[in-house]
Amino acid sequence: MEFSEWTKNKRKLNNLEELKRDIIEQFKEKNALDEGIVVMASGGKDSSTAIALAKDLGLNIEYLIHFYHRWSWDVSKKMVEKLSKKFDIPVIFYNITDELLKRTKGAKGSSICRICKNIMKDKAVDISKEKGIRIIMTGDSALEKVSGAVMNYLRDVYGEVVYNKMELTPVPQKYSKGKDKEVLFFRPLIRLACEDVLKLMDYYNIEIERAHEVGDKIGFWREGCCLQYADENALLNEKLFNELYKYNKIATEVAKKHGFRASIKLPSKKIMVVPKKDEYITLIKNALRDVDES
């Protein structure tokens, strides 16, 4: 399967066979080919596709970890349960609600996803350590900011970005400090453009049920959870989280029924729809009117 021109030119990766070969070589170099892997599984297209690719390579995935909180979409858990059954991998469900409330105290809306990701990464490292596993797999693709950190690490080690070593690195390095063996993060999709991830998803017959939110990457329909729709300068707290869930649950249910995507920013109550059509905004406004009046 050939990859997009962007992936070929910007990440020096031509096709799936090349990616598979590069990944196996990286595992061999780290003497990790037979080691166990723990996967941070969100239930979305990226982590699901990454799991399918890793299984295709014959890598040893021992556990899926699904992090959730009180305001998570039910559909995410459902998708992870399906993946667990499809690939016969046990899943650990881990509730981060209390930790999220603690770490977001006094923080602004713009930092919610960063805080949540850090909590999940910290806990994934802890769980992996308990299981005697040092490789953590994520569904990070070329869209992610961590791509830059991985490239910087490769520059430090090799003097340049060696693209065919991007998938298996000890980035972030803070988790390996003082350890006998470095903690490795395996990102099989880290060089792929979104369109290539979608191609791979089709190739592996991965079907994802959507919540029908707008998502954090306009144009790519990548979903997460309703808390990302807190206004940038809003003070994060439990009351706001409850409101975000209530409003966005209604909005996504309407959007799913009518075949579009919708999300509500709070406390501004800004309505976002994809595609942008007045009729869709009207549908959401009408659905939310009862909430505002109750």
Swiss-Prot record:
- Xref: PANTHER family: ATPASE, PP-LOOP SUPERFAMILY-RELATED, EXSB FAMILY PROTEIN
Name of the protein this chain belongs to: Uncharacterized protein MJ1016
Database matches in InterPro entries: ATPase_PP-loop_MJ1016 (IPR012122), Ni-pincer_cofactor_biosynth (IPR052188), QueC (IPR018317), Rossmann-like_a/b/a_fold (IPR014729)
Pfam families recorded: QueC
